[in-house]
A protein has these predicted regions:
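Bacterial N-terminal signal peptides
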Residues: 5-15
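Extracellular, repeat-based ectodomains that mediate carbohydrate processing or recognition
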Residues: 17-431
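Generic extreme N-terminus detector
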Residues: 4-5, 411
Length: 431
């Protein structure tokens, strides 16, 4: 039986640590998914009101019939409210590590979720999906009936999504969509709390890596930034960023966060993470597989995404795909969490910058030795940060890799992701 553990950690950030890096202290893990049979694809959100939202997906017998579970801890509360379980009438909620449900908090206090409902079609090699949205206005106690965000054919190649809330209270969703015959980056916006969504509009229809997640961020003035992995001439698969100053009507030419020049005839399932701080500085983290320069990078832009200054975070000659997540704090701190592709087994590591991303402290290993840990997520709340990730044994990790469908085989069929026999654990630090 596969045991896929998901751990959540919180550690105190040292105040006023301009000259040093924060020390993270973790308490022993405790199970937070005891109300469900299993759990996968952890999500974490810290809202402006101080709520902490933890989410995960479970499925009977560790299969693909996914339900979404959300646990909300109000600001100042000793513990969370009862877990709320969401089912979708269209079908199972996908437990996809590279395309998990996305959480966002808006200025009116709403908590929103964007997720994919998957469906296997007999005779087709790939599952299809629909992007679905739901929102809570009472702190996560109840949730609105789900609506479909993508237009056109409800089920299709709509996935690898991102969600954010703009300063004006509107919600922005981006995703990869192949409705025009090949994968591109698309967007929709809601100005009524997610009840209705605008006509879907393409951001980028040139070749796009079809299985790497998108990322979206909005600055204080309403400028929208979107990042993804483009397929450039020569099969170069580098991460790019574009900007819109008119609400998404037009977009700047995409700019590479770094000229990695990674040539690869496939998709690594490893998209970027993108944030913008209160000063308008853009922060991005990603992975590249270029031989001799492979690994995790971070870059910042002080000119609205026109240019970037990049730093290596964890780089070697070769590296397996890593999944990077960023978080920002109010004191110019930048946190980078990733699953290390340089070691024999993936492990979750974290580095923090106290000077806005100009330099980073040493890496801290958060997962246990001797296991395979992947798909971290990270958030900052108050003077603490939280990191969640998926974990399994080394033997189970190797077995999963061996059972993976080889989609280069024209007869191979990809199934919906399975949850596995997993659980969600919590680690919290004294503040």
């Amino acid at each position: 039986m596969t045991r896929l553990a998901v751990l959540l950690g919180a550690g105190a950030l040292l105040a006023g640590c301009r000259g040093g890096e924060p020390r993270l202290e973790f308490t022993p893990a405790r199970v937070v998914s005891q109300d469900t049979e299993n759990g996968a694809t952890p999500m974490f959100l810290a809202t402006p009101r101080g709520e902490r939202v933890v989410g995960w997906i479970s499925a009977p017998d560790g299969g693909a019939d996914g339900s979404l579970h959300l646990s909300v801890t109000p600001a100042g509360a000793a513990g969370p409210r009862p877990v709320v379980t969401l089912r979708d009438p269209l079908g199972p909620i996908e437990a996809h590590g590279e395309a998990p449900p996305q959480l966002a908090a808006d200025s009116s206090g709403g908590i929103s979720v964007l997720y994919a409902v998957g469906r296997e079609i007999p005779g087709q090699r790939w599952p299809v999906s629909a992007l679905r949205f739901t929102r809570s206005t009472d702190g996560g106690r109840s949730w609105s009936p789900p609506v479909t965000v993508n237009d056109g054919t409800e089920f299709g190649a709509h996935n690898f999504h991102a969600l954010t809330a703009a300063p004006d209270g509107s919600l922005l969703a981006t995703w990869l969509d192949a409705r025009e015959g090949r994968s591109g980056v698309w967007m929709s916006r809601s100005r009524d709390g997610g009840r209705t969504w605008t006509q879907n509009r393409p951001i980028y229809t040139d070749p796009t890596c079809p299985c790497c997640r998108t990322a979206v961020a909005v600055d204080a003035h309403g400028a929208i930034f979107v990042a993804w992995r483009a397929v450039l001439p020569g099969d170069v698969r580098d991460v790019v960023v574009t900007r819109s100053a008119d609400g998404g009507s037009s977009w700047s030419p995409p700019v590479r966060a770094r000229a990695d020049g990674w040539v690869y005839p496939g998709c690594p399932h490893a998209g970027p993470s993108l944030k913008v701080d209160a000063h308008g500085v853009l922060h991005i983290g990603w992975w590249t597989g270029k031989d001799g320069e492979a690994g995790v990078y971070y870059a910042r832009s002080d000119d609205g995404g026109r240019s970037f200054a990049a730093l290596p975070i964890a780089v070697g000659k070769q590296a397996r795909p890593a999944h990077v997540q960023l978080a920002l704090d109010a004191d110019s701190g930048v946190v980078v969490a990733w699953d290390d592709g340089l070691s024999e087994m993936p492990r979750v590591l974290l580095r923090r910058s106290a000077d806005g991303g100009r330099s980073f402290g040493p890496a801290a290993e958060l997962s246990e030795p001797g296991v395979a840990a992947s798909y971290p997520v990270v958030a900052v709340y108050g003077d603490s940060l939280a990191v969640a990730w998926s974990q399994t044994t080394a033997a189970e990790h190797r077995e999963k890799l061996a059972d993976r469908a080889d989609m280069k085989d024209p007869k191979a069929v990809m199934q919906l992701p399975r949850v596995g026999q997993s659980e969600i654990l919590l680690r919290a630090a004294a503040r």
